[in-house]
Every structure is written in C-alpha cells, then in structure tokens.
Amino acid sequence: MERFRLEKKLPGPDEEAVVDLGKTSSTVNTKFEKEELESHRAVYIGVHVPFSKESRRRHRHRGHKHHHRRRKDKESDKEDGRESPSYDTPSQRVQFILGTEDDDEEHIPHDLFTEMDELCYRDGEEYEWKETARWLKFEEDVEDGGDRWSKPYVATLSLHSLFELRSCILNGTVMLDMRASTLDEIADMVLDNMIASGQLDESIRENVREALLKRHHHQNEKRFTSRIPLVRSFADIGKKHSDPHLLERNGEGLSASRHSLRTGLSASNLSLRGESPLSLLLGHLLPSSRAGTPAGSRCTTPVPTPQNSPPSSPSISRLTSRSSQESQRQAPELLVSPASDDIPTVVIHPPEEDLEAALKGEEQKNEENVDLTPGILASPQSAPGNLDNSKSGEIKGNGSGGSRENSTVDFSKVDMNFMRKIPTGAEASNVLVGEVDFLERPIIAFVRLAPAVLLTGLTEVPVPTRFLFLLLGPAGKAPQYHEIGRSIATLMTDEIFHDVAYKAKDRNDLLSGIDEFLDQVTVLPPGEWDPSIRIEPPKSVPSQEKRKIPVFHNGSTPTLGETPKEAAHHAGPELQRTGRLFGGLILDIKRKAPFFLSDFKDALSLQCLASILFLYCACMSPVITFGGLLGEATEGRISAIESLFGASLTGIAYSLFAGQPLTILGSTGPVLVFEKILYKFCRDYQLSYLSLRTSIGLWTSFLCIVLVATDASSLVCYITRFTEEAFAALICIIFIYEALEKLFDLGETYAFNMHNNLDKLTSYSCVCTEPPNPSNETLAQWKKDNITAHNISWRNLTVSECKKLRGVFLGSACGHHGPYIPDVLFWCVILFFTTFFLSSFLKQFKTKRYFPTKVRSTISDFAVFLTIVIMVTIDYLVGVPSPKLHVPEKFEPTHPERGWIISPLGDNPWWTLLIAAIPALLCTILIFMDQQITAVIINRKEHKLKKGAGYHLDLLMVGVMLGVCSVMGLPWFVAATVLSISHVNSLKVESECSAPGEQPKFLGIREQRVTGLMIFILMGLSVFMTSVLKFIPMPVLYGVFLYMGVSSLKGIQLFDRIKLFGMPAKHQPDLIYLRYVPLWKVHIFTVIQLTCLVLLWVIKVSAAAVVFPMMVLALVFVRKLMDLCFTKRELSWLDDLMPESKKKKEDDKKKKEKEEAERMLQDDDDTVHLPFEGGSLLQIPVKALKYSPDKPVSVKISFEDEPRKKYVDAETSL
C-alpha cells in the first residue's frame, strides 16, 4: 500500500523533462500562468458571468474516447506545475518564453562557446573524444589533412539533419537545471534517467559510462606540448581574460557546486544512518506525512534523485522508473526513433531549504573528517592531462568545498590567444557525438546545468559548461551523427534559440525554439548551390530583434527595420527649452559635472597619445598659416605668434570647461574675410583697427551670453541631417581644395623649366644683373642702405641677395620670379601624395592579416603620426630643399606698436563703441552657426556618446574666450568641423574580443578632455620647439589636410546618393531608404541638396564669404519647404524629422493611442477569445466593444447572439 501511494505521487510520463524547481518546488498552489502573463503586460479582461443553467452551452455527447482525449490534452499542457497557454505558432511561444523574467540569475543568457567532440580511435588503439569543430559566432572546423583550424565560415546545415535533431529532442532525454559538479556525476545522472525511461539497457550502462568519460583531446594540445608549463590559479587568468565574477554571476557557481557535492556525500551515507530511502522520499514528496511531526523530529536527510544522486543509489532510480503509461503522439520516423512509447520520466528535485537544513547538522560532524579526492572543478576521468591533480587530495569538504585558489589549470595546454576572443562571462556548450559497437539504437541527452560548472579538460578553454548534448549510436552512421551535432551547435549560436535554451522550462519549449528556427531558415536548391563551399562571414550581421516582436492578432508584424523613424531629431534633454534664465546652462553643468573626473581617468590609453600627436601636427599648420594670412591682411597687427597664443589659450580653456571637449577649435575662412573687410574699413576711415575689433569682439561675446541665457541653442533641433551634411561636405571639400591649391602654389615658388633641351644643358645659366629702369622705391632703398648700382658686384650675388637689392635675373635657366629650381616641386608632389596614401593605408592596417591584433591596432592608432615621422626622415635623408614649417622663435607681439592688452576705445571716437554692435550681430550669427553645427555633427547618435552634450556650455565658453581674445588682440577661434570629426574618428573604441570571423563592434568614442587639452598645451609650447618643428616639410602637412578632408567624407550620405546617378538599378547597394522611397524622389532630394552645396561653395570662395553663416541658416528654411514635396515617411528615411508644434504633437499622440488600442483588440475573425478552466471558450465580438482612450476603461458588452441578450462587464487593463 505504501508503494502504491508513492507511485501515485511520482510524476508520470506526460509531465515534461527533468526540471529543478529550486525553492518553488514546495509551492503547490502557485498560479504560474498568471505570474508569467503579468510580466508580459498582457491585456486582461475580467468577465462576470451569472451562474445559471441557461447560460451554459450544451454539447453533443461524443463518446468516452473523445473526453479521454480532451483530458489527456489538458494534462499534457500542464508543464512543471504550471498551465501553459495555448499558442498558434512556435514563434508566439518563443516570444512568450523570451518575455519571461526569472528572478534567479541561472536563467540569464550568457555568451556561449560551443565545442563539438567526436568519439574516435587514437592511433588505432583506444577511443578518445577528439575536438572536430567549434563555434563562437561562426563555425571553425579542424581540417582533415592540415592539422589546423579552418577559416571561420557561416554554417550551412541540411534540412534533414535539423528534422533529425528535432526528433532527438522529442524522443531523447532532456534534463534541465541539473546540479552536478563533475563529469562523473553528470554521466551517472543521465544514465540513471535513460535506464529509468527505458532508453538504455542497464546491462550496457558501464560501457556507455566508460565511453562518456574517455579522455578529451583538443586541437591546440599539439601546439603547446613543448611549451614550459605555466601553472597559475584560475582566479589570476580571470582577471585578464575573463570576467572576474564569472562563476559568482552564474548563480554562485562554486558554492552551488559545493552544495551539490555535499548533497551527494550525504546521500551516499544513507545506509550509515539507517534511514530508509523510501521513507525519505515520501517525506519530501508527501507534505501531509510531516504535518503532525514536531520540528525537532523532522527528517533531516536529503533525498537522492536521478539528478543529484551518485551511482550508489540504484534503488531510487528503479523507483522513479515506475510510472503510468500513456500513448504519445508518434514523431516522424527519422534517424532517431523513440525508445519506447513513453517520454522519459520527470523527477522533481527536493526543496533547497530542506537540503540545507539536512546538511546543517551533518557539516558540523564531518567538517574535519571528509576528504574529497576528485575535487570540485576537476575530474580525473574527464581530463587526466589537463589538470594539476597534485593538490586534489588537499581540497576539503569543509563547507567551502573547492576554491579557485586550490583549483589549478595547466595553462600550458590552453590557447590563450583564442581565450582572449571569448567574451567576459561566457559559458560553454559541449556537443558529444560518436558511434560505438555495443549500441543497437541511438541514445540522446540534452542537459542544462544550474549553475554552470568548470569541467576542466572537457573544453579547450577554461570556461564553465552550461549545456551538454550527447548522441551515441550504432556504427555506420557517423556522418549523420556529425551533421546532427553541427545542427545543435549552430542552433546554440543562433541568438533566439540561445535565449530559449537558457529560459526553457520543458521539452516543448526547446521544440518550439527549433520550430521557430525552421520557420526562419532558407533552403537552397541542391542543383544551384554546392554545400561544400564555405560562405565568408558577413561584414555586418542582421539584427534578430524582429523575431522577438509578437505578431498582432490581425496578422501584421511590426518589423524594426520597416517602420519609419518617428523619434524627433535631437530629442534629447540637452535641447529642451527650460523657460528659465540660464536654465539650459545650469542643466548642462549638472549633466557634465559628474563626469569631470572621469574625463581625465578615461584618457589613460595609448589611443589618446596617438590622437594627441596626430591632431597636434594637424592643427599646427592651419593655425600658423591662418596667422600668416592674417598678418598679410592686417600689415602685421595680428600674425603667427598671436595666432599660436590665441589658439593655445582658447583651446585650453575650452577643453577644461566646455560641455563637449571632443570639439576642436580652429580658425575659419569667414572670420578671415571679416578681418580683411574690417581692416580695410578702418584704414579708409583712419580708425584704430585693434580698438574697433576689440569693441566688436566684446559686443559679440555679450550677445553670445544672451543667447545662452535665453536657451537659444534649443533652436539647433531644426538643424537636420540635410543641413549637417551640406555644411560638413562643404568644409571637407574646402580642406581638399585648399590642400591641392597650396600644392599648386608651390609651382610658382619653385618653378621648373618645361622646355629643356637636353643637348644644351651645359649652356644654361641664370645670373643676377642690375635693373635697367630702377623704380623710385628701389632707388629709395639703395639710398637708405647707402649704396649705388655701380658699387654692387651683381654677378656674384646669391639669389636671396639679388632679390633683396631688387636685381633682375637673366639667362636661359631663369623663370618669371627667379632661376628655375630643379626637383623641389616634384619632390613636394611625391611627399604630398605619399603622405596621403600612407596615412590611409596605415589607418586601415587594423583590418589586414599581418602581425598580431595588438600590433595592428597600435599601428592604426598612430597612423598619421607614423606617416609624418617616416616622411620627415625620408625628406631629411634625400636632402632635396623642400619648404619647411616656420614657427616664430620669440614670444612677443609681431607689431612693435602694440601690446598684449588692447583698449576697446583707443584713439577712436566714442560712438564707435555703439556702432560696433551692428557688425557684432553678424559676427554672432557666424560664431553661433559654425559652433552649433559642428557640435550637432559631433553629438550624432551614431557616435554613441554616453556623457551627454552641452550646447549651452559650449557656446558660453566660446563667447567668453572670444571676449578675452578681443581684449588681448588675438584671433577669434570657433569649432573647426573637419578637425573635430578627425578628433572623434581617432578616438573610436571597438570591441576587443570579437569572435573569429566577426567584425569588431563599434562601442563608442573615448570621451575625455585630455587629448584636446594636451593638443593646445603643445601648441602653446611650439615656440620653444622650433629646433624640431623646422624639419617638417609643408607638403607633408598638406597631405595630412587631404587625408582629413577625404576621411571626413566617409559616412556622409549625400555622396552615397550621388553615386546612385551612375548606377543601374540592379547594381545599386541595398540601402535602407531605397526600399521605401522611389528612386526618382531620392534623386530629387540629392539634386536639391547638391544645389545648396554649390551655392554655399560659391559664396564661401567669393568676396561675400562674410554672409556665409546666413546662407547656412537659409538651409533650414529650404529643408522646411521640402515638406511640401515629400511625405513625412519619405523624409524620415532620407533625413531627420523636424520638430512640430506642441498641438500637433498632442493630436498625433492621441491618434496613435487610438490606433494601438484598436489594433490590440482586433483579431483575425474580429473576436476576443476568453478560455476558462473547464475547457469552455467565451467569444466576444469586437464590434460590441466600445473603447475610448480618454474615458475609464470599463465598458458594457452586449451579446446579441444570446437568447436573453445578457450584458457582461468587461474591465480592460491596457
């Protein structure tokens, strides 16, 4: 009788795979379906139905067999004590599974490394498990003859092997959340379950166990046999190559392993304590038997089960094999057929609280006496060669079990280069397939460990194992077993099935994951594709998020890539108008202040040093050139030394206190044009140029502060990609144009003879002679120097002396401005283009195949600086006198009549202080547009900046420093677009550990203040570094300009659309906007943008360049007019959506909420189905529902089809 009661309580074959419920196993009446549905934010409709006989629908009696089938289906839907909701498709079930939120950390998905081992002969003598393939992201195979790993490739699977895998999961052993610490325990639990379910005959148990515990031979072992063993603790290697809290994050891995090990020890001592296993099992499975038992006399001995019992408890295994037999739905007959008509038994783990209580007293008795020989992380049978077992006998079972310090790994047999590619916190999935001669039919097992356990020697890298898949079968079908192993390994790398495997609660969840995967696969005809061809990994892997989105009841599916981008452009908090004086500035300071210290700590990287050296060389030349041009325009009032000092002072202050320190300040063309116009005006009206300029600068600074106070930077939200790209493209083109222009200007200075007669080279000469008709200026110069033309030996003068004395060059080797200079121009051309191509090549060196990853990454970071060093060295060795960078040697004002402090009034009339406000207004627009457009480009969302922007704080710093520079008589500096883009590009951060074959992922920008700060500090110290800087050839710096201009063009969508004009439709790239916008409209959008770009270019290079900022502002209005030609959806793909009025936003929001409500209530047949516990189904016509988002969500539903027209209250929770 006692045995009969036990069998009634043991699970039957209808219940699903072995699941360790942990602490919830003792909860009997928990409604799991409600808890899980609440986590999905589902819509609940509560219906109050009167209890009357008339309301019940009468069904025709269909016989006893029909009711028996209904009861069976209902029972089969209950899995692990929960009622599983019904689903129409596997995709819906998968979406439900992925939506569950588990409280424990054991079901949180981790990155997986999958390894497949096959059972094979070693040297024709004995079996061993040999590694044949591995997956981190893509598949890598061990080449048959080359004894090496193949290149990573996209795994191609046969459809038949996928169906065979599904049959394996359907008919094989599935054990979820197994608690085990060694491979021996795992093997014993799996084999016990197989014997209990009838899948394996007990007579061949030892043969299978011996095969499972064979040695594992990994591909990398041969390469490391000659290396001196380097034995360190696993904790040490974890600090560098893996997550230091890996095992703790995976559900307190070590402590759980120790707990499981103590459970096994306690279970093995049952006979010593004289307790009956049957009574213990009844004590756990029958709570009522303990109801009247005092706490003191309560059973404190843990219960061994097939999941946690060692092989010393066969009686328990035999007990669990007794279960009720019910017919199951026959699976398709493939390679693997069911072992019997019943699915393997479900075994319930005892509550974890009882196990801990049972062990409490036992630990106190055995703390000093128990000695664990195999240890926790080591199994002698699993890997005798991969462990240092000298200390295994010292690991005590004192409540702490083994520790990471005591568990050593022989790293002489670990491929550390591959270990670096494994993400932190990753876990392992082991696939074991093979053929043996003692099996008549295949045996299959899918095991999920909880927590993951480091089974040293099982995997080629020391990563904790989470999943195990076993397939052993009779000889003769090894290729089929191999393909099934590849199928499950490839499935584990699939993003969706990977998550399903972690969150699955039963076998049906795994089958749904496979079915969902089959729904997504593409079959290639065998006659049109050779499966042996290895597909190269794609540059970018498509997102799988659309597979996680539930399908609406009306059948439509909202895919992420096919919905227009409704989010407003620049909708972040940085550009929200506060309505308070200096409100935006205060928020910027609050936003950036917490990151101030990290802005300096985050610069501790070699990449920042490379960026400093690159940008220093790139900024020096334009600043000095701008100062030289300004000196020519102002007759030395402001020149190179003032430009260097102003750039250094402004840049240091901006880098320290600005909201976006990634922005680099520099000089701009419109500022130079403005300076020229102002100087000409002052000279014509005999005004003091520096004083009037100071007045204008102070007014401009004041107006910038007013813009900051009124949150005017919030207007930046109207600057969309249309304006950004036109402005950025123009600046890039100007950089390219000016670089080429400066190269051609060298042709005037270093002229060469294009009409040489090689036979008369000996007769060519060029001498200095007396000017035939000296000008009055020349005569005045001679008189001042107290010389006459007759006293000068003209033919003996050098070129510089001849030019100083205003002599004339005569001869066949003379040009218009002096003698021909051989080789210099051509050498400059060589330096120019070599610098450009070498910089581009070294920057892309990171993706080459030569040298280790670290070397390639360092070369790529220092690409421009290395190029400059190489070209300077070559120029020095060749010795051709190329033009060099000239830096002022003294720190003093260029003009002797000025100082470092300028009065705003000076010698000018008082009214000039008031009149200066008019040009200051134009200058303010210039500064505002240049600064904010550059800031918008830097703060683009594709740069993935994490510390936020600070538009108001940026403008404040520029305005304040503009006033300081005006008072000191220094040039004005504002954000430089190309330099800032180059600065951002030099600080890009990519993922360090990328799977073989996978492209590194862009993580963001290294946001810090040190690079900008050091660039401008070095610029200020350049006066003291002239002895080094004088060796830099100017053509090399021009080549750097060309490189910055060309590299900044990358990523500008305008140029991608320009290329479409010359491409036939079939050769056009798969650009996202070409899917949803007609091609002719794309061309119209491009033509409009290109026209605006040409107009900006014409204005920029003309005398009207001072109004250039006004034209940039006009682009915003042009973009606004484009709303008349394009739809909102088209503009969302081609450009960013412009902000709309507040009223229109509210109307659109209400309209969208209404559409969402209607879509959620709509079904294929316009009916809402409400299932009840008795199996009945209530159907509510949607047309009878009246819903309004503005009213309370309690409505009346009339059932017109019912005889008495009853009314039901429906409460909806949306």
Swiss-Prot record:
Feature: compositional bias, Polar residues: 379-392
Q: Where is the composition biased (Basic and acidic residues)?
A: 1-12, 73-85, 563-572, 1144-1162
List the GO molecular function terms: monoatomic anion transmembrane transporter activity; sodium:bicarbonate symporter activity; solute:inorganic anion antiporter activity
Disulfide cross-links: 766-768, 802-814
Q: Which GO terms describe its biological process?
A: auditory receptor cell development; bicarbonate transport; cellular response to growth factor stimulus; phagosome acidification; purine nucleotide biosynthetic process; pyrimidine nucleotide biosynthetic process; regulation of intracellular pH; transmembrane transport
* Quaternary organization: Interacts with CFTR through NHERF1/EBP50. Interacts with USH1C. Forms a complex with ATP6V1B1 and NHERF1/EBP50. Interacts in a pH dependent-manner with CA2/carbonic anhydrase 2.
Give the protein's biological function: Electroneutral sodium- and bicarbonate-dependent cotransporter with a Na(+):HCO3(-) 1:1 stoichiometry. Mediates the sodium-dependent bicarbonate transport important for pH recovery after acid load as well as for regulation of steady-state pH in the duodenum and vascular smooth muscle cells. Plays a key role in macrophage acidification, mediating bicarbonate import into the cytoplasm which is crucial for net acid extrusion and maintenance of cytoplasmic pH during phagocytosis.
Name of the protein in its database record: Sodium bicarbonate cotransporter 3
Q: Lineage in the entry? A: Eukaryota, Metazoa, Chordata, Craniata, Vertebrata
